[in-house]
A protein has these predicted regions:
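Small-residue hotspots at the loop-to-helix junctions and early N-terminal turns
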Residues: 1-2, 6, 76-81, 138
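Residue-level recognition of pore/gate-forming positions within transmembrane alpha-helices
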Residues: 2-5, 40, 53, 62, ...
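Helix-loop junctions and terminal segments of transmembrane helices
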Residues: 4-42, 97-102
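Alpha-helical transmembrane segments of multi-pass membrane transport and lipid-handling proteins
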Residues: 11, 38-91, 121-129
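Interfacial helix-capping/hinge residues at the ends of transmembrane alpha-helices
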Residues: 19-20, 61, 94-98, 124
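Helix-capping/transition residues at the boundaries of transmembrane alpha-helices
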Residues: 23, 101, 109, 127-129
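Membrane-interfacial segments
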Residues: 23-26, 63-71, 131-135, 159-164
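Membrane-interface helix-loop junctions in multi-pass transport and translocation proteins
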Residues: 106-107, 114-167
Length: 167
């Protein structure tokens, strides 16, 4: 969680400053600039996140042993790798969410997104119920994040004319 929080803080510093420009360009009915900013921020945040997450994922066992010594809990390395991979998709979700805020039509998007988030708990429970390894709890979170991405794409397509293939 600490690794995830540190990287997410860095990525937030990329995404958050773009929000006023995206909202202003949408309010000015400049959809071309809105999408250009959204795509650029999505690509930049995802690239930076991936550039930090990949070496951490590769060397996670060394990092954990250096940080925690010999008392690294079982499954920790896989939990971290899955969360890093999950948050790579989160870098794509956040800029789409900004566009939805700019439209002012949040009800549909929030309904889809909230339903997706609520899905993670029963999905994780089912994974554990059928005897899956603990890492599958984090796979449930990954599925939720991908579902949130699709919820954002569907919403922006419906309310802001985003082409599915453009994103």
């Amino acid at each position: 969680n600490q690794v995830n929080s540190a990287i997410n803080g860095f990525i937030a510093n990329i995404i958050i400053p773009s929000r006023p420009q995206v909202i202003q360009s949408y309010a000015n009915d400049d959809l071309q600039r809105t999408w250009r900013l959204t795509f650029s921020v999505s690509k930049l945040a995802t690239l930076f996140f991936f550039m930090m997450a990949l070496p951490i994922s590769i060397e996670i066992n060394y990092i954990l042993n250096f940080w925690l010594g010999e008392s690294v809990p079982e499954h920790t390395s896989w939990f971290i790798v899955i969360m890093l991979f999950t948050n790579t998709f989160g870098c794509l979700v956040s800029p789409i969410s900004t566009v939805m805020h700019a439209t002012g039509k949040m009800k549909f998007y929030q309904s889809l997104s909230s339903a997706s988030n609520l899905l993670s708990v029963p999905l994780a429970y089912v994974f554990l119920l059928i005897g899956a390894i603990p890492e599958f709890v984090f796979v449930a979170l990954f599925i939720t994040m991908v579902t949130n991405l699709f919820a954002g794409l569907i919403s922006t397509h419906k309310y802001a004319n985003l082409s599915y293939w453009a994103y």
